């Protein structure tokens, strides 16, 4: 451990040489990319995020794009999946309708997403992460939390230096860049990784956490989206520092269980650990009936509820799927599996249900079923999901309604809101 009263020690991110306390450039290589912090060698929890991932992969593979604004996305009816940093200077943002993006940056090069390639590169980065520590929690194809506690013996370096070496290796061997956030908890590690993109490495220590957060907007807190931020603003709460002055009981009285999160995260308190999960190949939900069912209306009643469960899990896992899979098991234990690939990925219960219903209608022929399941496969980044549908103008309204329902469920619990398909229906076996 280092003395917090001593001048911050640190190292050069380019050559990894230790640095004098007050030098402004590396004494060995001349680089200005010096990393110093009084807690630098004590912190072990990191968030790693690839910089403008899809666009960076395309620029790597086509050097002619290096100095050009690049947008990854669909056609004019689609939305922006990723924009490189040059395009972002012109105001292009993820999830922006493509026509607006091209109005903001008409000279942009638009590239259709190549998900197979991105997944392949993402797995290369993930494999390098797992060489650092077994405690890797992927959040999406291009980002993850890492807990490097106890890895000093393995790497002969504290986590900060191990992470800097990792970032250099990704850049040299894979050809893209990453940004690193290092802290003592997941919330602030993720916040830190966004502070100096691209090629960033930012540190937030425990001693400075409350002061660092004080002036930040409430939207920085995990789980505070636009709708909930508007609720807080109506109550006169805009900055995290205002939450720091409030009692936990008061926040819980006003905002339910979300109030406890506001109280703790506003103070930099986050005990969540890095969770190891195998990489999901699909997300699904199924139910076995107490009595065999043959009528379409009975099967549909279950299908809708299962679709909502799948959508809920996709949203919580920050995933979307491009192929909808229907599973049926007959009364004599024979399994039927049907699937349909969508034009664009989805994470919406409505699209999952409607596609599943089309598949189900072809299987309702008097056969009795003892089980029904619905799921999605070909999992991708949620930024690619559910572009606006100009052919079906009601699709956007249904999506907006589903988002509103999800926000209510996040605030009051999964069973707080029922749709017309599930309200009053039995849930046997679920």
From Swiss-Prot:
It catalyses: DNA(n) + a 2'-deoxyribonucleoside 5'-triphosphate = DNA(n+1) + diphosphate. Binds 2 magnesium ions per subunit. One of its GO terms (molecular function) is magnesium ion binding. The record marks 54 as: Substrate discrimination. The active site is at 143. Keywords: Cytoplasm, DNA damage, DNA repair, DNA replication, DNA-binding, DNA-directed DNA polymerase, Magnesium, Metal-binding, Mutator protein, Nucleotidyltransferase, Transferase. Mg(2+) binds at residues 49, 142. Its EC number is 2.7.7.7. CDD domains: PolY_Pol_IV_kappa. This is DNA polymerase IV 1. The lineage of its organism: Bacteria, Pseudomonadati, Pseudomonadota, Alphaproteobacteria, Hyphomicrobiales.
């Amino acid at each position: 451990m280092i003395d917090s009263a001593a001048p911050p020690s640190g190292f050069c991110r380019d050559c990894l040489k230790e640095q004098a306390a007050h030098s402004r450039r590396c004494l060995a290589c001349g680089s200005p990319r010096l990393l110093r912090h009084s807690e630098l060698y004590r912190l072990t929890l990191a968030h790693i995020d690839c910089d403008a991932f899809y666009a960076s992969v395309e620029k790597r593979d086509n050097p002619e794009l290096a100095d050009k604004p690049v947008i990854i996305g669909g056609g004019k009816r689609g939305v922006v999946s990723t924009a490189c940093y040059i395009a972002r200077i012109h105001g292009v943002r993820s999830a922006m309708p493509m026509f607006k993006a091209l109005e903001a940056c008409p000279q942009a090069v638009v590239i259709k997403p190549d998900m197979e390639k991105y997944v392949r590169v993402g797995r290369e980065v993930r494999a390098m992460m797992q060489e650092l520590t077994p405690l890797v929690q992927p959040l999406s194809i291009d980002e993850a939390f890492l807990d490097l506690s106890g890895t000093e013996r393995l790497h002969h370096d504290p986590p900060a230096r191990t992470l800097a070496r990792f970032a250099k290796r990704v850049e040299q061997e894979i050809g893209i860049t990453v940004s690193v956030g290092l802290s003592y908890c997941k919330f602030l590690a993720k916040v830190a990784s966004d502070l100096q993109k691209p090629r960033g490495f930012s540190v937030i220590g425990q001693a400075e956490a409350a002061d660092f957060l004080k002036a930040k907007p409430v939207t920085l807190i995990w789980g505070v989206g636009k709708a909930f931020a508007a609720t807080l603003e109506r109550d006169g709460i805009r900055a995290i520092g205002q939450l720091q002055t409030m009692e936990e009981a008061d926040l819980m009285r006003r905002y339910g269980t979300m109030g406890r999160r506001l109280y703790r995260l506003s103070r930099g308190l986050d005990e969540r650990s890095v969770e190891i999960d195998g990489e999901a190949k699909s997300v699904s939900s199924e139910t076995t009936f107490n009595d065999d069912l043959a009528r379409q209306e009975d099967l549909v009643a279950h299908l809708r509820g299962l679709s909502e469960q799948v959508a809920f899990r996709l949203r919580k896992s920050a995933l979307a799927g491009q192929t909808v899979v229907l599973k049926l098991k007959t009364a004599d234990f024979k399994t039927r599996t049907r699937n349909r690939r969508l034009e664009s990925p989805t994470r919406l219960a409505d699209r999952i249900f409607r596609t599943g219903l089309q598949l189900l209608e072809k299987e309702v022929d008097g056969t009795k079923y003892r089980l029904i399941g619905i799921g999605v496969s070909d999992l991708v980044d949620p930024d690619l999901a559910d572009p606006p549908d100009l052919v079906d103008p009601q699709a956007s309204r249904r999506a907006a309604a589903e988002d509103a329902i999800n926000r209510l469920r996040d605030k009051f619990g999964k069973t707080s809101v029922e749709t017309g398909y599930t309200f009053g229906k039995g849930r046997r076996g679920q």
